[in-house]
Amino acid sequence: MSQWQFKLFEFDIREELETDKNEFIPGRDTKRFIIQMYGIDENGKTACIFVKGFNPFFYVKVLDEWDNSKVTEFVAFVRKEMGAYFGDSLVSAKIVYRHKFYEFDNKKLYKFVQLKFTSIGAFNKCKNLWYNETKYGEDRKLKENGLEFLDTKTTLYEAQVPPLLRLFHIRQIKPSGWVALKNGHYSQNRKQLTTCDYEFTVNYKNIYPINDERLEKICVPFKILSLDIEASSSHGDFPLARKNYLKLATNIVDYLINNNIETCDKDLLSNLIKTGFSYRINKDIEKIYLKKSITEEELDELIDNLVDIKPGKKENYIDIKDEDENSDSSDIENDGIVEEFTTKKRQKVTGTKNKDSNILEIINDLTCNRNTRILELAKCFGQHNPNRDNKWEGKFPELEGDQVTIIGSTIRRNGEDKPYLQHAIVVNDCNSIDNVVIESYKTERDALLAWTNFVQRENPDIIIGYNHHGWDEGFMYDRSIELNCMTQFSKLSRFKNEKCIKEIFQGKNKPKKITIEESSTKLASGQFDLRYFKMSGRLQIDFLNLFRREEQLPSYKLDYVAGHFIGDNIKKIEYDENCSILYSKNLTGLSKNDYIVIQEIGYSTDQYANGKKFKVLDIVDDKIILNDKITPDTNKILRWCLGKDDVGPQDIFRLTNEGPEGRAIVTKYCIKDCDLVQDLMRKNDTMTSYDEMSNLCWVPKSFLVTRGQGIKLTSYVAQKCREKNTLMPVIDKGIDGEGYEGAIVLEPKCNLYLKKPVACVDYSSLYPSSIISENISHDSKVWTKEYDLDDNLINETGEKDENGKFIYDELPEYDYIDITYDTFKWIRKTPKAAATKVKSGYKTCRYVQFQNNEKAILPSILDELLGARKSTKRQMKNETDPFMQNVLDKRQLSIKITANSLYGQAGAKTSTFYDKDIAASTTATGRKLLIYAKELIEACYDNTIEETTNYGEVKCYGEYIYGDSVASYTPIYVRYNKSIIDICSVEELAEKYGNGWHLESPKEYCELNNIESWTENGWTECHRVIRHRLAPYKKMVRILTHTGLVDVTDDHSLVKNTGEEISPKDVSIGTKLLHCTMSENESNIESDISIDEARIMGFFFGDGSCGIYDCPSGHKASWALNNSNKELIEKYYNLCKSVYPEFEWKVYDTLNSSGVYKICFNKKSGSKSKIQFIEKYRSMLYNKKSKIIPSEIINGSIELRKSFWEGLYDADGDKDKNGYTRIDQKSQISAAYICWLANSIGYKTSLNIRDDKTDIYRITATKNKQRRDGDKIKKIVNIQNSANIQNSANIQNSVNIQNSVNIQNSKDNQDYVYDLTTENHHHFAAGIGNMIVHNTDSVFFTFNLKDLDSKEIVGKKALEITIELAKKAGWLATMFLKSPHDLEYEKTFLPFCLLSKKRYVGILYEEDPNKGKRKEMGLVLKRRDNCAQVKDVYGGAIDILMKDQVVHKAVDFVKHSLQDVIDEKISQQKLIITKSLRSYYKNPKQIAHNVLAIRIGERDPGNKPKPGDRMEFIYIKNSDKKALQGDRIETPLFINENNIEIDYGFYITNQIMKPLQQLFALVLEDMEDFVTKRGISMKSWKAEIDKLHEKWTEPDKFSKKYEELRCKEVKSILFDPYIKLLK
């Protein structure tokens, strides 16, 4: 052929000897690194390509001063450190210049030395020089100063990248792509070392990738072998290839416990042991099977020796299975092999009080737990030594293990539907089976070797199975050792005569451990141990392991998985005589003569005809023809699924021993399982998925199968670093106990939304886009600064110059952004307590922003990925070839998974590019964006008129669910018409500057015109003021810093000095909040007020009064200045005469009666009215009852303001001991004016409140430096609103809370709280002083639609409009975001029931308002440990609420259902609960279904449930009130046979009640029985809520108790009547 082309699929690393004769030279490393590439051409011919000439290498960072001579010295030093054996294998060292991956350095190039090696052994030996020496099994740590050479630190780079992957990167070879050999630059091997069709040797520079669209469309015909074995079981339990005495020890100890035998003497122990050896009879002791029988006399001698053994003298270890008895294995199941997929726990056998105790003393020591007694006894018999090839060590004879009986294999070519060969190797005779090739052998040994020959003969490319890595291959390997044929059996590789085993070095003077590949897979469900053969040239895929990683399934049993994937909905059913014709869409995996089960899916899933399996007569197009006439319930969703053969473990063991006919049944079952795995592989198109992920991340498919996602991301990042001339350092695993705030989950507003559609928008690729938009990357991070909770700088990173200035900060050619996140530590309160996550401070990271849209490495990677995914999805739309459509779909999915994994991997401590700051900065940006989206949408659709496509203009009232920020009397600083500054209460804004309140509902809005609010960014446009009544459960708190005071609700209303929002619940004494001193008015408006009049007005503000009022003697008016200082009174008396000469002024001595002198006036004849003068003062210096500073002075000259201040000080000021000016006020408005005035004339102010009189506000002013940090909180005070709030809320730790404040609000607005919306993220200055506050956010948004006549729009019309507006809202939000952020419309719910985080149900609509489907998450409908009746009742209630939207109708349905339970109208099938039986429990008597299993074994030994069996049971009545759970359940069959009463009450109180309580608690106030009970006024209900507040003052605890109270109320009105009937 003109050019050899192959698609790669598997790789192996080998080393050959250097010399021509391939001779081993003692004392010298003569091996050379070789890569074996296995490929296949389009005709199915395989090739092994030996790639030579590539030397593994890594880099060492050195000083810039190094030259070639220094490198030469360094190489000599390293060779010496490597030792004589490996030293000469370091063959190359050269200086290169590269960028480094961590920290921004303005693209500086650093000096590195590249070290190359001839062998992987030398590569590792040299790499280890940078690590500290560790004991075997310990994690290695890098040396703190690297490898020191001549007092110089050298740092290791890129040694974490496997040389195989390095070759891919250099040669641009995709590991699952096509390659070609350069003509004339390769040799074809005549004498082949492998069993491939072709074999080549080529230099790595002469193999290159092919990017050919024609080849990409070829489905290469891989030969795929599916494996499954069956084995015998001597005890009827799970087969064990090698057995010890643990089973006998367990039987003995349990016998003693169950029979309450406290003292076991030698005779009893001897009899129990002899029972196991069949010399005695005892039904509780199972027989053991020996490899070689012994006489009773020989056994007596062994027992005599055993009772004298003192096991505590030696440390001894034994593998046991450890499972949490409180967990339910219903979520984690296996194909009859539960035992092999439990987490192994290596236990040191301890627990005896005396190490000198013999085994009898240990057995009788009741202080020892059951496990210790069993394990101590078991080790006295003997055990296999794992460090000596599992050799048996012990006095007692070795036991016979269970045997392989059948090895099934089916082989299919990739792209074909069915296997072309079905093959079985059977021990002993077996009847023939249609289309199955059967080989029978007399011995197990011959059968094992026959399978090796079969593999070599058929030569598959891929071997698949279902848990064959967890059990089948390991079991066969162990049996081959037992049968002394391991060497021959293990020759399964494509490399001729290669044994697929490995030798593990265990230390000097210790024998090497011989084993097969062993690894562990850690998943959420536990750690799973894998053992399998590494077969060179054959890719292996274990589908159980694959599905555990990638699919969330209720069960992983093969029959369930097959039914889950191989099945589809039934569209319709037709009949032809006695046959049924089922129409369905996807029939992949189903064949003629298969069996299917019909499912009826409602709230629970019922098996039609009790799960009967129907034979498939034929398949025609999209039609399944059955041999029966079926009539399922067509009102439910109907689904067919593959029905796996019903052959249980016990049946397999029995049939195998029943002769050729029985073995044929088991063999057929075995072959069917092989076929099922083939079907699953084809249905899921596993090869295409692996191809795409492999090529994307530059890793072989085998890496994806056997290794975690870390290696694929390491490869991907390393390849991208290579493109940017950048090197990754080798780093240690993260070990600190610190953390950061993870991805945000917004607090839900739990409720039942029946009439208003609830829209949902979502960011497209939120976290990858956050990295791109903010340029978050290792190489863009300039510095970090970490602070504790007291704002003390505790750590910083980043390169500084000799003056301590960051070198790469504030460079003129770059912009920078800061991202702040909270830091946490895991702390144990006591040494034995569980560690809890506690906030420890915060950290700010600065990232550089490059010019011209250039990106750092991580953002550029993600930018490329997101772009590639969009491009791939566009290709999919235009592609017509189904094969390529599927390829492209798998490709875009691989891209999505990789992009979403990158930021998480950066935060994983085991990652090769770990950097907590990257992950934390990403989630912090994500939180910020989510909050932005909510605020923008709510603000932009608040009281607006929107144009819609089909309904014209509609009114929008985007629902604000802001945290009710401030009290009605709170001072607000505003500016009108960009010129006039005003200070007024927040409730006055609408009156003074608004156009009236709108939307008379729980929330009211008032648009503001030409108003700005003061913020940290200066004057910012203020759009509207919002108010609503304070809910009874809401709490208010006063926050006092040294320079600010504000009364707020306990929602997110404050802002930290870093700009981050914070709730009053989370602050404490010392927390720094955001403040910003208001600037003086630059407009300086002209005024008629003179300097002297301003002083009089200041004095009046401090101690003056005036008013017009009616009294019994008639209409009166008064005006007075008051003071006890005679000299001051004389001074202001003369000032008044001068400023107001039109009046007659007098001084009255009221010192004895009032304690002051008074200055008053009378009208002169012909002068202006006294009342006019008083009205002027009232209008200028009063706001209702509070004194204010006239606008003319606030906005006037500094001379006017200073004069007013002097008058104020004369009247009401004094000096403290430090000489500071001090003024007290009773009004927040007045105090706010004084603070502003003082600041405007150059004073610094501080605030305080008195402990005895908390409504007195003290302002202290000075022009000196203030002693304390003005931004820190110094007091947190509860507020009692006499109009509404009766209880005191504990917002913070009680040591930080002062006494409560009693606030009297204005009568009209006594229970309102207020918020502002501004352009500055809703920040605004509020309260006394300089504090900036913030309002909060909602979880969902609804548009509260109305037509132009203000009539509410609901139902389908509202749904259609909501979908349209939600799309516009997403587009609007995206307009103001950095690229590539895109806020996309996702879905709309109507109705919607939100129970809690990630627990909801609703009718989901996407684009079409006519196409809705029920969507649910986290509900009991999904849980498998609930009986079907729970799902039916709960689902029925949900259905009524969703469809009919009538609460009382749902209540009636539940009542009717409860009555049916009491009346025993419910079928037993609806009450059955199922759980899987495990092989081991710590406390077996506490596991109900395990107790039932024991009970079944006692009454029917032949049918005792075994580990892996799924037990069905129903709760029954038991007259003993102290009966444990195990005595309160029974099997349905036993209940019927013995007329046992079912405990229906249990199902109401323990199964049905709790989920329905949570559901109806959401609509409690809409339940008619609740209104009847509590009355329309709900006074008693509100009183209970108040009591709850008093008892549970912490918000989180209150919320929990409040929910419990609501659930309790539901129980009392809905369930208690029926519970009483049961009693």
UniProtKB/Swiss-Prot annotation:
Keywords: Autocatalytic cleavage, DNA replication, DNA-binding, DNA-directed DNA polymerase, Nucleotidyltransferase, Protein splicing, Repeat, Transferase, Viral DNA replication. One of its GO terms (molecular function) is nucleotide binding. Coiled coil: none annotated. SMART domains: POLBc (SM00486). It catalyses: DNA(n) + a 2'-deoxyribonucleoside 5'-triphosphate = DNA(n+1) + diphosphate. This protein undergoes a protein self splicing that involves a post-translational excision of the intervening region (intein) followed by peptide ligation. GO terms for biological process: base-excision repair, gap-filling; DNA replication proofreading; intein-mediated protein splicing; nucleotide-excision repair, DNA gap filling; viral DNA genome replication. The keyword Nucleotidyltransferase applies. InterPro entries: DNA-dir_DNA_pol_B, DNA-dir_DNA_pol_B_exonuc, DNA-dir_DNA_pol_B_multi_dom, DNA/RNA_pol_sf, DNA_pol_B_thumb, DNA_pol_palm_dom_sf, DNA_pol_type-B, Hint_dom_sf. The keyword Nucleotidyltransferase applies. Its EC number is 2.7.7.7. Belongs to the DNA polymerase type-B family. This is DNA polymerase. It comes from Chrysochromulina ericina virus (CeV01). The lineage of its organism: Viruses, Varidnaviria, Bamfordvirae, Nucleocytoviricota, Megaviricetes.
